[in-house]
Amino acid sequence: VAPAQTEPTLKVGVKSYAASELLKRPEIETITVKHDPAYGGREMRYQAIRAAALFAETKLRDDDVMQVRCRDGFVASISKERIMRAGPGQSLAYIAIENPKAKWPDLPLKPSSGSAGPFYLVWLNPELSGILQEEWPYQVVAFEVKGRLRDLYPRVFPRHQQDARVVRGLKLFERTCFACHTMNHEGPSQVGPDLNLPLNPTEYLKEPALPRYIRDPKSIRSWEGSKMPGFGPETFSDEDIADVVAYLREMAFEKSHAD
């Protein structure tokens, strides 16, 4: 006799919610995501709860960050201000819940890993707030409430440089690269290598190789098991990539920060 399967459970702060419990809540909606990044841009329909409604039960301070942990070790860090938006003219965050009796399709790029479920953070009107692909974490297991990133991971932040390009690059790093990489051995995820120790990418990938690598990693090097996605123009403009490179270049001078 096969062992009984455990029902998927989502942790939100100190609380836990079973999938069946969430699917019965009065706030549940049927939503349509017109261009779903987890499914190759196809249109998908989900049973989902507005993040602002579910997280209203969790005490959040204005400067708190929600770290979204996924089954494969990916961790997206999303600010309270961003994930709790509820007004018109803004992107709206939803937690999509997979019904165990009506499974979603397998992920097209990772069919062996199953679907995007059991829980998936999706957005309606993502273009209104510039939502990036890394802010669509799937196979979510927990939403962890954290304080300010600067307090949690001070070595990620330049100590002296206030150049506007570096500041913009840091913000993009927080929303994208930080989901997989650490900086000076600080960060919530270790899916990818540290981006400063022992070497910073700017020290071994020179122009134009580094911007090209960020845009399309497989155009520089490719191997079985490589996980890093490319960042197309719809995610990163050429200027965005230049800003991220400026931040990385600055951090190459701040390795002593990790001592």
How should these model regions be labeled?
Residues 50, 165, 173-179, 184, ...:
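Short pre-active-site segment immediately N-terminal to redox-active cysteine/selenocysteine motifs
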Residues 169-184, 210, 228, 244-248:
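The canonical Cys-X-X-Cys-His
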Residues 190-196, 216-251, 255-259:
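Axial heme c-ligation environment in periplasmic c-type cytochrome domains
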Residues 6-152, 259:
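Structured, non-membrane catalytic/scaffold regions adjacent to prosthetic-group chemistry
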Residues 2-4:
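Sec/Tat signal peptide C-region and signal peptidase I cleavage site
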Residues 40-48, 61, 162, 166, ...:
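Solvent-exposed, acidic/flexible segments
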Residues 147-172:
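Electrostatic cytochrome c docking/interface patches
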Residues 182-215, 230:
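Gly/Gly-Pro-rich "capping" loops immediately C-terminal to redox-active cysteine motifs
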